[in-house]
Regions:
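N-terminal active-site beta-alpha-beta segment that forms phosphate/nucleotide-binding
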Residues: 1-111
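Surface-exposed, charge/polar-rich loops and edge strands
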Residues: 1-5, 12-15, 111-116, 124-128, ...
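Receiver (REC) domain switch-region micro-motif
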Residues: 42, 116-117
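Glycine-rich, N-terminal phosphate-binding loop of Rossmann-like dinucleotide-binding domains
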Residues: 46, 120, 179
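Short glycine-rich anion-binding loops that position phosphate/pyrophosphate groups of nucleotides
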Residues: 48-50, 121-125
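Short, well-ordered strand-loop elements centered on a beta-strand within folded domains, enriched
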Residues: 78-85, 128-130, 181-184
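Mid-sequence acidic-hydrophobic segments that form the walls
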Residues: 102-105, 119, 143
Length: 184
C-alpha cells in the first residue's frame, strides 16, 4: 500500500466515525494520565472537522493553569509551523485551510517536559504516523526536538497493522499512541 492509498483508506474510514464521541473519550483517557497531570506546558493541535475534537483539551489546559501552545501554519508551501502561546480560546481565528489558528505571541521553543499532542490520519502498531502529506508535524517534531512526552491522538479504528514510511517520518513508540480506549 502506498501513502496515497493509505490516506484514502483512512479518510474513508473516518467518515463513519463519531469523532466528537471519540474525542470526548480520548480526552477522558488523557486527563487520567500522569503525563497530563505533570505537564506545566501543553502543545496541542486545534482539531479540524475530520479529527477527534480537542476543544475540551484546550479548555482544560487553560482552566488548569497550564501554559498552552498551539501551531500556526506559516505562509508558503514548505510545511512550516510556529509555536504560539494562547491564554484564551478567543485567541483562535480562522487561518490557512480554514483551521482555527492563534493570534497570540510566538515562542521560540517548548520548555523541557512539555507535553505534545500530535494529530494523524492513521498510525500503525509500530508507531509509523500517517499525516496529511505536507510534513508539518514531522518538521515540527524535528525542529523543536521534543524533550517531554508526546502523544499521537488516533481513533482506534485507524490503528493499522502496517503503514508505508519514509526516512523523514518521525516515528512514535509504544506508549505514545492515545486512542479512545487508552494508550497503545
Amino acid at each position: 500500500m502506498t501513502k496515497t492509498e493509505a490516506r484514502a483508506q483512512a479518510k474513508a474510514l473516518r467518515k463513519n466515525l463519531d469523532l466528537h464521541a471519540i474525542g470526548a473519550a480520548m480526552t477522558q483517557q488523557l486527563f487520567a494520565l500522569p503525563a497530563w497531570r505533570q505537564a506545566g506546558t501543553v502543545f496541542c493541535f486545534v482539531s479540524m472537522r475530520d479529527e477527534p475534537d480537542t476543544t475540551a483539551i484546550l479548555q482544560q489546559a487553560l482552566v488548569s493553569g497550564k501554559r498552552l501552545c498551539v501551531p500556526r501554519c506559516l505562509p508558503g508551501n514548505d510545511g512550516r509551523m510556529e509555536l504560539v502561546e494562547i491564554t484564551s480560546l478567543n485567541d483562535l481565528q480562522p487561518g490557512r485551510y480554514g483551521i482555527l489558528e492563534p493570534c497570540g505571541r510566538t515562542i521560540a521553543a517548548l520548555e523541557p517536559g512539555a507535553l505534545a499532542l500530535i494529530p494523524c490520519l492513521a498510525v500503525d502498531k509500530q508507531g509509523v504516523r500517517l499525516g496529511r502529506g505536507a510534513g508539518y508535524y514531522d518538521r515540527f517534531l524535528t525542529r523543536f526536538g521534543q524533550t517531554g512526552p508526546k502523544l499521537l491522538l488516533c481513533p482506534e479504528a485507524l490503528v493499522f497493522p502496517a503503514l508505508p514510511t519514509d526516512e523523514w517520518d518521525v516515528p512514535f513508540t509504544p506508549g505514545e499512541i492515545l486512542t479512545e480506549n487508552g494508550v497503545k
